[in-house]
A protein has these predicted regions:
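Acidic/polar-rich alpha-helix caps and helix-coil junctions
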Residues: 1-71, 103-236
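Periplasmic/extracellular electron-transfer cofactor-ligation site
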Residues: 29, 97-98
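Domain-scale macromolecular recognition modules
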Residues: 74-76
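Short, cationic low-complexity segments
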Residues: 78-94
Length: 236
């Protein structure tokens, strides 16, 4: 109809993918955003609580009047580190990654340390490679697969009117890259999409350049992109 697909110039399925690729590329180009670096991702004071170079769109809790109560606040729900105002630390209702998803993240992917490995859970000291505000005693309480992605505001574990004040990610540029890759698989072919996915992963997420998409058709390419969306945007 004139108010729907016709108005967008879409007459076939592939037109949808062409538009998706075009809009995703426009968002990348016009936002001025860059994928998060490893240091931004793992920053103990600002990691996933303060907008940075990759965030296109956010919501903000900037005052205690906006906050109301930690119990139903964003940071109170998703953070694992505070025993004063998070459901994880206070109520033991930790937000965890599923084991089946975690097991699909290779060691070469630096995002893997976002979650507590089963072999590291319960240790008396914080194992190497993790970014956390906790000391050994706090670490020992974390169950396997607990997330360390969302740090309290300003890295404050004790004052809810500081730790629960934060920015909330609604859209990051990484999602635009992944939308673009999935879309061009339909318009330019699987090999073209694989090349862009390989380049993205090795430039921004792998430490050794070893990522290589093994997709052989549209379905397996979509599965590869979906896996990266699940890892990259976990909890968002």
């Amino acid at each position: 109809d004139a108010d729907g697909y016709d108005a967008l110039g879409i007459t076939a399925v592939n037109d949808c993918f062409a538009k998706a690729a075009s809009y995703a590329q426009a968002a990348i180009d016009n936002s001025g955003c860059q994928p998060m670096s490893q240091s931004e991702w793992y920053n103990k004071k600002t990691g996933f609580n303060t907008a940075n170079s990759s965030w296109i769109w956010k919501a903000s809790l900037g005052t205690k009047e906006q906050l109301g109560s930690w119990f139903y606040s964003w940071m109170g729900t998703v953070s694992s580190e505070s025993t004063a105002f998070s459901m994880g630390g206070y109520g033991k209702a930790y937000r965890m990654i599923g084991a089946s998803l975690y097991n699909q993240i290779p060691d070469a992917d630096w995002r893997k340390k976002t979650w507590v490995a089963p072999e590291d859970a319960g240790k008396a000291e914080v194992p190497a490679g993790y970014s956390t505000l906790l000391d050994g005693a706090g670490w020992a309480k974390l169950p396997a697969y607990t997330n360390l992605k969302y740090h309290p505001g300003s890295g404050n574990l004790s004052d809810l009117y500081v730790g629960c004040l934060c920015d909330i990610p609604l859209m990051r540029v990484e999602e635009m890259y992944l939308i673009y890759i999935e879309a061009i698989a339909h318009t330019e072919g699987v090999d073209a999409a694989k090349t862009v996915l390989n380049d993205f992963m090795n430039a921004y997420r792998y430490t050794d350049g070893s990522y290589e998409c093994q997709a052989t058709d549209i379905e397996s390419l979509e599965d590869a992109v979906l896996l990266q969306k699940r890892i990259e945007l976990w909890g968002e």
